Swiss-Prot record:
Cited CDD domains: HisF (cd04731)
Localisation per UniProt entry: Cytoplasm
Any single biological process term in GO: L-histidine biosynthetic process
Lineage of origin: Bacteria, Pseudomonadati, Pseudomonadota, Betaproteobacteria, Nitrosomonadales
Protein name: Imidazole glycerol phosphate synthase subunit HisF
Signal peptide: none
GO molecular function annotations of the record: imidazoleglycerol-phosphate synthase activity; lyase activity
Active site feature: D12, D131
Pathway: Amino-acid biosynthesis; L-histidine biosynthesis; L-histidine from 5-phospho-alpha-D-ribose 1-diphosphate: step 5/9
Source organism per UniProt: Nitrosospira multiformis (strain ATCC 25196 / NCIMB 11849 / C 71)
């Protein structure tokens, strides 16, 4: 059956706080990234993704501090993205305890960054994040949080990123993000089938069946979700049990 499929909660961090409606009832502090990371670790998450959505560069050291703290207490792989512009940024995040670094806008502005970072640290720790929107018969890559069109075809871009050394693709449907209507399965499948590296499906999860669909119909290797876990509607463990009942191999 191949490798177990992964469930990855995603935490958006700004100014040292997790945002996007984290409402864990029993948390003393609903915005504390370390406490939330520990909670997901306890629930059996396979990995965690932290996206630093802080616009200003003066807060960069804050995310490094958070990653150091989380890495000291949580022993599942951590992917960190947001504001990675040069190889030095990759180095600092890996040194702080990140296992993988996600590159998004900078990969488009400077594709060589992906090649340089993969060359220095290995493809296994370089993730390229692609935000895509439906455009005609295909999908177009957007940057700056889905606000800026690039004119790039998402499938071709994913193939190019793989060829430059990306070890994983984090694929978000901007059409579905936040809708809770499920992944864009056609997009997920098209990219998953076009590349050999793992694809993480993101954007649109509203229930546990959506996670199953992402793997079975979308051919994704991993599924990422935020609000369904943050709001406490489902635990990661419930999600894994549901996927397992539907014939998907997961790490229980």
């Amino acid at each position: 059956m191949g490798l177990a499929k992964r469930i990855i909660p995603c935490l958006d961090v700004t100014n040292g706080r997790v945002v996007k409606g984290v409402k864990f009832v029993s948390l003393r502090d609903a915005g504390d990234p370390i406490e939330i990371a520990r909670r997901y670790d306890d629930q059996g998450a396979d990995e965690l993704t932290f996206l630093d959505i802080t616009a200003s560069s003066d807060d960069r050291d804050l995310i490094l501090h958070i990653i150091e703290e989380v890495a000291a207490q949580v022993f599942i792989p951590l992917t960190v993205g947001g504001g990675v512009r040069k190889v030095e940024d990759v180095r600092r995040l890996l040194n702080a305890g990140a296992d993988k670094v996600s590159i998004n806008t900078s990969a488009i502005q400077n594709p060589q960054l992906v090649a340089d970072a993969a060359g220095r640290y290995g493809s296994q720790c370089i993730v390229v994040a692609i935000d895509a929107k439906r455009a005609g018969q295909g999908w177009e890559v957007f940057t700056h949080g889905g606000r800026k069109p690039t004119g790039l075809d998402a499938i071709e871009w994913a193939k190019k990123m793989q060829s430059l050394g990306a070890g994983e693709i984090l694929l978000t449907s901007m059409d579905r993000d936040g809708t809770r209507d499920g992944f864009d399965l056609a997009l997920t499948r098209a990219v998953s089938d076009a590349v050999d590296v793992p694809v993480i499906a993101s954007g649109g999860v509203g229930n546990l069946q959506h996670l199953v669909d992402g793997v079975v119909e979308g051919h994704a290797d991993a599924v990422l979700a935020a609000s369904v876990f943050h709001y406490g509607e489902y635990t990661v463990r419930q999600a894994k049990e549901y996927m397992s009942q539907h014939g998907i191999e997961v790490r229980l």
